[in-house]
Amino acid sequence: LINNLLGAQQAVEYLIQQGHKRIAFIGGREDISTTQERLQGYTQALNKNDLPVDESLIKIGSFKRDSGYFITNELLKLDDSSRPTAVFAANDLLALGVIQAVRESRLSIPKDVAVVGFDDIEFASLPEIQLTTVSQPKYDMGRLAFSTLIELIKGGGYASGRKILLDPVLVVRQTG
């Protein structure tokens, strides 16, 4: 499993280091542990840096691009003193929607609104996107899944309580 908490902390800490104080969180469904863990990492990073957790900047939708787009349009309607200067999206599809909404509003990324996603999907590195994102160690995840499968096939069993967390890495590109 990926350490979602750590990845979210890395993303928000990076935005804080860039000078952002009003950072929005856009997440997927509330009943999914991924959303809960990434939201927890977001709030912990804000608390660690003595920044308030503003509930009006925490938005939950789905993990789809459209959700990021519509939620960002609502956030951008806030007055200048309330509007976020950065958005941490709980996945890259949400972040793509955020980017679309910010660009359509004729705001500059990252000057007016910085955007950080999570997952490092293939589209994140395209020249026209260049999304700053938290990258999951896909190779290590696959290797671990394969070795676990081999262990099961050999009859070695699998410790049902065993939980391995892999650390993500922040990949800084142009949107952050």
Where are these regions (language model features)?
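Bacterial carbohydrate/catabolite-sensing allosteric modules
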Residues: 1-176
